[in-house]
């Protein structure tokens, strides 16, 4: 599918005889960046290694006894390959392309051959994942703010060599470029592999998807059901975007294990989804609404489900899916393992966790009682007059580095569409919201992932469903209805260890959120603008005086047209009509006239940004 085409493809660089052995040069075809890889230590870096700094070799496997997981038959590969004998019948919505990344040697001393499951194999020799693996479990937990409760809980698995995963699965993980487990993976994997129920509370972008998928793959090795009689694993997610992305991860990392997965979501024809179920699927990823529809049609059986995952449980409850979730769970055997992942821990989520889980272990990453933003994201809060928002937005887009992907959030579908029309000509923007059909949404997301449309304008429907790893910036054109949605929106950037930027336009009508926003900013060590503090202090708006961005004006009237003001100059409010876009009074009287693309500038066009250049290239 097109989703996999957007993934990075890594190839070897031309041979460089000046590189010290065993270093090799690699090129990321997506970005064109050259970096260097040491196959002995699995270290990658952008700085060219020099002979004066020889690479550090590590023993094949060296695992601290404090984090060693006992290898039992529970994690061993099956003794026969009957489980996977129907490979040609398996459901796969993605092509069986080769894995990207450098190859791993087979047949070396203490190495691994190419034997499939069922044949004798040994564990993959892996390098040490220093410095994390050099820490004690207690120090690792303190560093990553991991707290656990629920009786005897095993220590975190701080390196991949400590997991005891099958070699084929480890190759998939390593070829994806991961050097060490994320904190949520390190702590949830050993608990899940014990067969215990889990409540995991962690921010978005923490690696939770693999946190439950990989133990699920191991579960499938032990529970060898006939997938034509029904799935063994069920993953419930709030949105179709998130559901399809979970399926993509399941197919990508389960390919070598011949694990089949299908996805059930609304907004698409039921026919292809029903045919996938008839062919058989080990894993079903579904939104609650569509799964309930298919259950009522009696076209799926959940009697074989023994591994249930509720991903973004808080979001599903916010969207009103609790009745559907409870109805689905009634169809699943009570003898099962249940894993719940959530970004927040409100009373509603606690209640459903108490009802559905049995003696769970709770894993917290960071402060659970307070809503906390990702500290890897630099947050910019700007008090902006409604008539100045688009001008400021264009400046932000022009300031981004070449290749940057940007998401802009609006409050309403109407605002989303209008802003997209205004930005398309210059920046290459596309809209995604609830009124778009599934083919339209898929096309927009594929264009965004590939970079052909580098600006995505979205309503909150995409705030928690979209997972694109290289988003550089998020712009809150409209402030959301609460700080929870604010945190989820900006969490689209700064994922998987990367940094990001979030720009938020804050107005007089948003002043009721000022106090809560200050807590979020201070909790993430971010600067709080004086105007926001003033709003919080007096409980009123901060735009009663002239601000840096323009004169006082009325609220944007969420869903109206007033949010699309004239293009006032960033430095001066006297130059608004210089390019034909500054007729604020005409715009307010007849907004329909301004839905067209802007006329050419009478004073000359500014230099093209990367986004404009990309649009010209692809026309």
Curated annotation (Swiss-Prot):
Transmembrane segments: none annotated. Keywords: Acetylation, ATP-binding, Helicase, Hydrolase, Nonsense-mediated mRNA decay, Nucleotide-binding, Nucleus, Phosphoprotein, Ribosome biogenesis, RNA-binding, rRNA processing. The modification Phosphoserine is found at residue 136. Residues 552-568 have a biased composition (Gly residues). SMART domains: DEXDc, HELICc, WW. Residues 61-71, 125-139 have a biased composition (Low complexity). It comes from Arabidopsis thaliana. InterPro entries: DEAD/DEAH_box_helicase_dom, Helicase_ATP-bd, Helicase_C-like, P-loop_NTPase, RNA-helicase_DEAD-box_CS, RNA_helicase_DEAD_Q_motif, WW_dom, WW_dom_sf. The modification N-acetylalanine is found at residue 2. ATP-dependent RNA helicase involved nonsense-mediated mRNA decay and ribosome biogenesis through rRNA processing. The Q motif is unique to and characteristic of the DEAD box family of RNA helicases and controls ATP binding and hydrolysis. A motif (DEAD box) lies at residues 311-314. It is found in: Nucleus. It catalyses: ATP + H2O = ADP + phosphate + H(+). Induction: Down-regulated by abscisic acid (ABA), salt and cold treatments. Residues 78-93, 582-595, 609-619 have a biased composition (Basic and acidic residues). This is DEAD-box ATP-dependent RNA helicase 14.
